UniProtKB/Swiss-Prot annotation:
Key words of the record: Acetylation, ATP-binding, Cytoplasm, Isopeptide bond, Nucleotide-binding, Nucleus, Proteasome, Ubl conjugation
Crosslink feature (Glycyl lysine isopeptide (Lys-Gly) (interchain with G-Cter in ubiquitin)) location: 280
Gene Ontology CC, one term: proteasome regulatory particle, base subcomplex
Role, per record: The 26S proteasome is involved in the ATP-dependent degradation of ubiquitinated proteins. The regulatory (or ATPase) complex confers ATP dependency and substrate specificity to the 26S complex.
Annotated gene: RPT3
Designated name of the protein: 26S proteasome regulatory subunit 6B homolog
Subcellular location: Cytoplasm; Nucleus
GO molecular function: ATP binding; ATP hydrolysis activity; identical protein binding; proteasome-activating activity
Modified residues (N-acetylmethionine): 1
Biological source species: Saccharomyces cerevisiae (strain ATCC 204508 / S288c) (Baker's yeast)
Biological processes, Gene Ontology terms: positive regulation of RNA polymerase II transcription preinitiation complex assembly; proteasome regulatory particle assembly; proteasome-mediated ubiquitin-dependent protein catabolic process; ubiquitin-dependent protein catabolic process
Presence of the UniProt keyword Nucleotide-binding in the record: yes
UniProt binding sites for ATP: 213-220
InterPro entries in alphabetical order: 26S_Proteasome_ATPase, AAA+_ATPase, ATPase_AAA_core, ATPase_AAA_CS, NA-bd_OB-fold, P-loop_NTPase, Prot_ATP_ID_OB_2nd
Length: 428
């Protein structure tokens, strides 16, 4: 029957089954497409809502940004007005004072140059970390408010001697004084240059040195040689400079000297004429005497307090060692005391004359030995004065060399006898 083209119903049914299957798959595919479209629509809806949400957040952030910018412009205007106000306050003439101690974040205790202490307000723009006791500050002239912090050495006359300011005196320029040279170099110069020697031996180098002796014996000149031979910072101050009009200024100056020395360590402090502030303490009856004793106490405290590792050495010179306070002379403060004798032996006089004459133009017949062998009491300053006077006499006579007659006349002029000394006793 297949050959005749006749298909039976069973065979027809068999042939129709793939069509049914194709329709079912098509229907399923259509349903899947609908589901996919529905899911895609849901995704697009979620993205749309997220977009709207982000747009609202963006608008909110934009408003916040505009508000912050307005607030920033307002704060800048306020800051500018505040800076102008601070500048106006600091532009008027200010009073120099001293900061004593803080009370809280906004107030503190200061002392003015009049000697009075005040509880004052502290300008809010100042760095509280920089406010230390004994610092120099600027006070408002009307309210005494603390408006500025001055540099540490702004109102101090103490300064470190620069390299170009150091004296050109060397040890070779100091005639004689061989023992004094050795002692001061061991106590001052050697610890600064070769500190490891003292560490190996196990001893501490001397803290301070006292040079004492009559006037004109070479104390200051030897200190100049020390300053020239070392690279340490050199601070020179006279004892009378510590005495001020207002109470507290002298001790503060002592603290400033040692603070400056510690900041520039290794350093040497030279206090000349120390007897003006370091005399023996007594029951003072006047304010000035009590102030001098406060200066001495501060000096003793600083010499006890500064650390050995800072390499700060103290040299003091005086003509009256017998008047100094025993607390200053004890070991631990002034460990080495070097005496400068007024009477020089013949060898010392020869060295001094030779040192001074080496820089002068002497005639070949000039005989220094005739002056050296004399037994008059001659200090180094007197010998220098003799040679200077001889040079002046040669200049007076339009000569370029110094003759023996110039030396004799200068010697007679400078070396006074008992009769000529009475001429200077005006107040008898």
């Amino acid at each position: 029957m297949e050959e005749l083209g006749i298909v039976t119903p069973v065979e027809k049914a068999v042939e129709e089954k793939p069509a049914v299957k194709s329709y079912a798959s098509l229907l399923a595919q259509l349903n899947g497409t609908v589901n996919n479209n529905s899911a895609l629509s849901n995704v697009n809806s979620d993205i749309y809502f997220k977009l709207k949400k982000l747009e609202k957040e963006y608008e909110l952030l934009t408003l916040q940004e505009d508000y912050i910018k307005d607030e920033q412009r307002h704060l800048k205007r306020e800051l500018k007005r505040a800076q102008e106000e601070v500048k106006r306050i600091q532009s008027v003439p200010l009073v120099i004072g001293q900061f004593l101690e803080p009370i809280d974040q906004n107030t503190g205790i200061v002392s003015s140059t009049t000697g009075m202490s005040y509880v004052v307000r502290i300008l809010s723009t100042l760095d509280r970390e920089l406010l230390k006791p004994s610092m120099s500050v600027a006070l408002h002239r009307h309210s005494n408010a603390l408006v500025d912090i001055l540099p540490p050495d702004s109102d101090s006359s103490i300064s470190v001697m620069g390299e170009n300011e150091k004296p050109d005196v060397t040890y070779a320029d100091v005639g004689g004084l061989d023992m004094q040279k050795q002692e001061i170099r061991e106590a001052v110069e050697l610890p600064l240059v070769q500190a490891d020697l003292y560490e190996q031996i196990g001893i501490d180098p001397p803290r301070g040195v006292l040079l004492y002796g009559p006037p004109g014996t070479g104390k200051t000149m030897l200190v100049k040689a020390v300053a020239n031979s070392t690279k340490a910072a050199f601070i020179r101050v006279n004892g009378s400079e510590f005495v001020h009009k207002y109470l507290g200024e002298g001790p503060r100056m002592v603290r400033d000297v040692f603070r400056l020395a510690r900041e520039n360590a290794p350093s040497i402090i030279f206090i000349d004429e120390v007897d003006s502030i370091a005399t023996k303490r007594f029951d003072a009856q006047t304010g000035s005497d009590r102030e001098v004793q406060r200066i001495l106490i501060e000096l003793l405290t600083q010499m006890d307090g500064f650390d050995q590792s800072t390499n700060v050495k103290v040299i003091m010179a005086t003509n009256r060692a017998d008047t100094l306070d025993p607390a200053l002379l004890r070991p631990g403060r002034l460990d080495r005391k070097i005496e400068f004798p007024s009477l020089r032996d013949r060898r010392e006089r020869r060295l001094i004359f030779g040192t001074i004459a080496s820089k002068m133009s002497l005639a070949p017949e000039a005989d220094l030995d005739s002056l050296i062998i004399r037994n008059d009491s001659l200090s180094g300053a007197v010998i220098a004065a003799i040679m200077q006077e001889a040079g002046l006499r040669a200049v007076r006579k339009n000569r370029y060399v110094i003759l023996q007659s110039d030396l004799e006349e200068a010697y007679a002029t400078q070396v006074k006898t008992d009769n000529t000394v009475d001429k200077f006793d005006f107040y008898k």
